[in-house]
Amino acid sequence: MKKNLAKATALLLTAGMLGGTGITAAASDVELNPGGTYPVVKDGTLEFDCFTMSMPNVEDLQTNDFTKYMEEKTGIKMNFLTGGRDDWSDKLNLMLQSNDYPDVILGVSPDLAKYGVKEGMIIPLDDYLTEENVPNYLKMMEPYGLDMTKEADGKIYSLADINVCYHCQYGRKMWVNKRYLDEMGIDVPTTTDEFYDACKKFLEYKPNGVAIGGAAQGWYSRMQDWLIDAFVLMPNTSYTTSQKDTIALNTDTNEIECVATDDRYKEAMKWIKSLYDLGAIYDGDFTQTGEQLKTLVNQADEPVLFFTAGTISDMIDATSNPDFYKDYECMAPIAGPDGTRIAFQTPNPGVNSGAFCITDKCENPEAALRWIDFFYSEIGDLCSQYGADEGTDWVLNPEGKVGLNGEPAKYEVLNLYSAETQNHDWQDIGIRVAPADYRLGQAVDPDVDVHSTAGLEKLLYDASAELYAPYAGTSNIKLFDEMKLTDEESTNISVIAVEVADIIESDSVAFMTGAKDIDSEWDSFKDSLDKAGLQDLIAVYQEAYARSSEGDETEATTEAAAETEAATEAAETTAETETETAA
């Protein structure tokens, strides 16, 4: 396939007609404008089927103002197929397995080792990643390098999502209704004992209340993960297998282990069961969706004391319910029995492959890439997040304003984020293109009320810096970013990882609720994991970890050699200059 294709044949089998031309796409060559210019399509309209994740605060992607803006700007229309936050993965996998899948996949990551490397349904993009097609993307990726997006076969099957979000690193947060604590005359808990006592007193104060709210799905909504951290660092869903297999590195032994088989995990289960026996844990915490948790939190009688969420705005809207929003504060991790306070910190720097993929159904990859490249431009993220009307939705370089980092602000958001349903922008749908200087460059009034819509970023930044960052890195459990597996490795553990995660989830819930006695069933639990193939899963992780460690050492050696060579050249140049000067 040619790298710099200015003219491409687009056989749009499901699309019908080019917009307004009366010419079928299947019978016409579609001419593209030069790279980096808009519209992408010189005449008419290209159509692609696009799968992405929908969100409840966006009414209809197809009729959304930003969607229309992109159609007018690029000459490309996306026909959206969507899955919700809780079921997108199942829907996408079903599409891929049934051979009825879209041209492009946006904002959600399929199994690239399976559907890309092995089966070829998702195509390699290496030959298309040129200045002609993706100038903004290449510039944005310069600090990180394209190598990080390569799969085990050395090819690139996706573009990256860049969201170097400080508060997202500490997304596992607990929120507490401070008004209730004040009315009960108690402080924010700092230990497991104090947390238990707060729950007990709350249930006496509000007998029909829910002391701890959580959800099975949602952005950091699993309450048990936050509670387990008081005993041992609980891994998040694996970046490698997309399963909650709890695999991590024990830095004391430099060996891969399953945290769910650690004795500290067992003690965490016992403590959480004591909370369940107290009546502090709502049964729905283990099964409900994030939306159902939101409904629970927002009931008229305000029944919830504690709830887990990556951001309070996922649960309470500051605009429509400002007083209730102000009742809640973020609280720091609590200390476990040994006195250790552990804060979860994601191992991922905020740059992830899998954000935009093109399938072999797509007849014009160049056009699809030029469409997505806008998102990597200076204003792409602003337009998708907040709307495309400069001066109304946002402004660049606002005079006299400072960012979260205290430096001159790069932009100011005028159309603030809202949890209420709207149809002007995409907000969190699609991809984020937000490097650190961009995130920290958002204009913030230093005196802003952090309990207002305008103060959300500062609220999350301050909570992360003051309450969570001090307790990060205090555990001997080290979490992994994505490990690149070979196709064989991925195939060998794909079923194992699911079975291991299912056993951990089902048995852990049984332990926490008392359906199973953890003391009598602990050995049986570990045996069932081994029978499911846990040791094979650990072995694959260990091998991948060894490969990544070798790669890090090679990279470090290469960088050192390059620095030495540069220093030598500089010294030689200096010597030559001194010789010429002396002459």
Segments from the language model and where they lie:
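Bacterial N-terminal signal peptides that target proteins for export
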Residues: 1-9
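Conserved small-residue motifs centered on glycine
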Residues: 53, 379-506
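Loop/turn elements at helix/coil->beta-strand transitions in domains of secreted/extracellular proteins
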Residues: 44-48, 74-79, 99-103, 120-123, ...
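Extracytoplasmic/periplasmic substrate-binding proteins
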Residues: 220-246, 273-441
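Short alpha-helical segments and helix-capping/turn motifs at coil-helix boundaries
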Residues: 33-36, 87-94, 109-110, 142-145, ...
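Helix-loop-helix "hinge/cap" segment bordering the ligand-binding cleft or interdomain interface
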Residues: 126, 153-226, 249-299, 356-393, ...
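Conserved N-terminal structural module of periplasmic/extracytoplasmic solute-binding proteins
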Residues: 8-10, 23-194, 238-247, 251, ...
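Bacterial N-terminal signal peptides
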Residues: 11-20
